[in-house]
């Protein structure tokens, strides 16, 4: 059974959301947000304590998955242990993976996981009226000005649609 209301996140997503000024608003979505317990020490901006207070939950890897993480890490050196832990948790829960890392996105897609990024999350925030379209456009512009690397065609399409 797929846990479609559960989103397993990497750390990049939270940085983009903070840069966009919409960290609080994302928790207005009807999703449960999980991140690997490995990520706690990486979440210094935004701080783990803030994210936890807003609703982000940490998820431990099952012991059997820790061994698999070691093998995955050897085969995917460009990905961090935290990124691979997010992948393994999403796969184990049959949940959706949210990532800002194209390498992790590729790995997830090749393994049949549902995977999305911050643009999808912005779409969901507009769809569920957690933010207005104009607010989404402003947040996206802030993310881009802070160095977010997003598919140009995709973000331009959204900016055009949300700014009208």
Regions found by a protein language model. Give the residues of each.
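Glycine/proline-rich loop-helix segments at beta-alpha junctions forming the active-site rim
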Residues: 107
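A short alpha->loop->secondary-structure connector
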Residues: 110-116
């Amino acid at each position: 059974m797929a846990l479609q209301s559960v989103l397993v996140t990497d750390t990049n997503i939270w940085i983009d959301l903070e840069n966009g000024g919409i960290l609080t608003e994302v928790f207005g979505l009807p999703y449960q947000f999980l991140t690997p317990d490995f990520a706690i020490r990486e979440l210094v901006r935004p701080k783990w304590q803030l994210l936890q207070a807003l609703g982000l939950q940490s998820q431990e890897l099952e012991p059997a998955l820790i061994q698999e993480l070691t093998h995955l890490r050897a085969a995917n050196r460009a990905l961090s242990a935290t990124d691979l832990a997010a992948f393994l948790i999403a796969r184990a829960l049959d949940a959706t993976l949210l990532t800002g890392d194209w390498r992790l996105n590729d790995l997830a897609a090749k393994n049949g996981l549902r995977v999305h990024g911050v643009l999808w999350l912005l779409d969901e925030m507009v769809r569920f009226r957690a933010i207005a379209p104009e607010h989404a456009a402003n947040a996206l512009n802030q993310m881009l000005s802070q160095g977010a690397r997003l598919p140009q065609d995709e973000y331009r399409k959204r900016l055009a649609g949300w700014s009208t």
